[in-house]
Curated annotation (Swiss-Prot):
Subcellular location: Cytoplasm
Protein keywords: Aminoacyl-tRNA synthetase, ATP-binding, Cytoplasm, Ligase, Nucleotide-binding, Protein biosynthesis, RNA-binding
HAMAP family: Tyr_tRNA_synth_type1 (MF_02006)
Protein name: Tyrosine--tRNA ligase
The organism of origin for this protein: Rickettsia rickettsii (strain Sheila Smith)
NCBIfam families: tyrS (TIGR00234)
């Protein structure tokens, strides 16, 4: 199966500037294509997983993935579909975040000097040295303000009478220049991104055509939500991070294990590398087979992101907790100072400190709603004092929020 054919078959396709021509070119030759990522966190989360899998697919078909870390544009902020002005990051924050993002990506694609090896570039390398007057003189006449004002991302903010700074308005010019720069210096002929980036991508392709006459393309993916309408990558407990220092492999496994029934087939297509025969089996699942399919999906996606050993460990932990009622050492763990437990801490504060609630009021609400357990016993009193008497044989306290979120507290 060719790259574009598989791209469409997996459900990645939304829009392309010239699909027929791009299909023909990618059949004849290998291309370089890029996707940009913001530098706003020290890890990517599953909201970026489709883009990452596309980079992986590119590489598997012998094309060269280029990853752009927006070290330059992160200093401004992309207004695309954002309701508010974005916080501007320091150079130190951007450098730290870029390192974490490369760690996320390295789980899925190979970086190096080979023909199809991925490269990662920071657009600060060329944007930081910009002379503003030179930029206006050399490129300003190629951009139409009339057209920019019609873009949905800008129009939405204007219609809501929300602040749109000139700083942010320049973002689309800089992203267009990124594409031009990569086309000129790295022979990049394709920019990929979410459907919300369509306007920015087309501006870049137009800029290249006007200046150099090169044939380049833009292709976008659909914006994804779960079947219930929730945004991919976010849960009530926070983001589903790819790096294990922010989210344990067990919690990553549990996210996929607990996906909605209606999402199983779609997630298997988008995020796994199951064969077509295996996908066909997913599509014809009987009701009694759904849980087994979810376990298989969670296992494969955890193996892909972390390792086979991490997936096995997560599966074994889940079996011990949910099927055998045991405590497993591989559960996520937080450490509490011994002095705190000796003095005693209220139940609601313990759930908050352990990260099972985002606020103390949320922890109280959890307990009042009969959703909290300590050592598998329901917590009836939010002010109940938890001390060293609650430590089990392994010197841990097991906290549970609902049926599916568990954590061990150690001293």
């Amino acid at each position: 199966m060719r790259f574009i054919e598989e791209f469409i078959n997996k459900g990645y396709f939304h829009q392309c500037t010239d699909l027929d021509r791009l299909t023909a070119i990618t059949k004849e030759t290998k291309i370089a294509a890029y996707i940009g990522f913001d530098c706003t966190a020290t890890s990517l989360h599953i909201g970026s997983l489709m883009q990452i899998m596309i980079l992986r697919l590119l590489q598997q078909h012998g094309h060269k993935p280029i990853v752009i870390i927006g070290g330059g544009t992160s200093k401004i902020g992309d207004p695309t579909w954002k309701d508010e002005v974005r916080k501007i990051l320091s150079k130190e924050d951007i450098a730290k975040n870029a390192e974490g993002i490369k760690k996320s990506l390295s789980k899925f694609i190979k970086f190096g000097d080979g023909k199809s090896d991925a490269i990662m570039l920071d657009n600060a390398e060329w944007l930081d040295s910009f002379n503003y007057l030179d930029f206006l003189r050399d490129f300003g006449s190629y951009f139409s303000v009339n057209r920019m004002l019609t873009m949905d991302s800008v129009k939405l903010r204007l219609e809501r009478e929300q602040h749109l700074s000139f700083l942010e308005f320049n973002y689309m010019l800089l992203q267009a220049y990124d594409f031009y720069y990569l086309s000129k210096h790295y022979n990049c002929s394709l920019q990929l991104g979410g459907s919300d980036q369509w306007g920015n991508i087309v501006m870049g392709a137009d800029l290249i055509r006007k200046i150099s006459g090169k044939e380049v393309f833009g292709m976008t993916t659909p914006l994804l939500t779960t079947s219930s309408g929730a945004k991919m990558g976010k849960t009530a407990a926070g983001a589903v991070w790819l790096n294990e220092d922010l989210l344990s492999p067990y919690d990553y496994y549990q996210y996929w294990r607990n996906c909605e029934d209606a999402d199983i087939v779609r997630f298997a297509k988008l995020y796994s590398e199951f064969t077509q025969e295996e996908l066909n089996r997913f599509e014809s699942l009987a009701a009694e087979d759904i849980n087994a399919a979810k376990k298989q999906l969670a296992y494969e996606l955890t193996k892909l992101c972390h390792s086979e050993q991490a997936a096995k460990s997560a599966l074994e932990t889940a079996v011990k907790i949910f099927e055998e009622g045991q405590i497993d050492e591989n559960l996520p763990t937080v450490v509490l100072e011994q002095e705190v437990l000796q003095a005693g801490i209220s139940a609601y504060e313990l759930f908050y400190e352990a990260g099972l609630a985002t606020s103390k009021s949320e922890a109280r609400k959890l307990i009042r709603g009969n959703g909290a357990k300590i050592n598998d016993r329901l917590v009836a009193d939010e002010n109940m004092i938890i001390n060293t008497n609650f430590l089990l044989d392994k010197k841990v306290i097991k906290l549970s929020a609902g049926k599916k979120r568990h954590i061990l507290v150690r001293v």
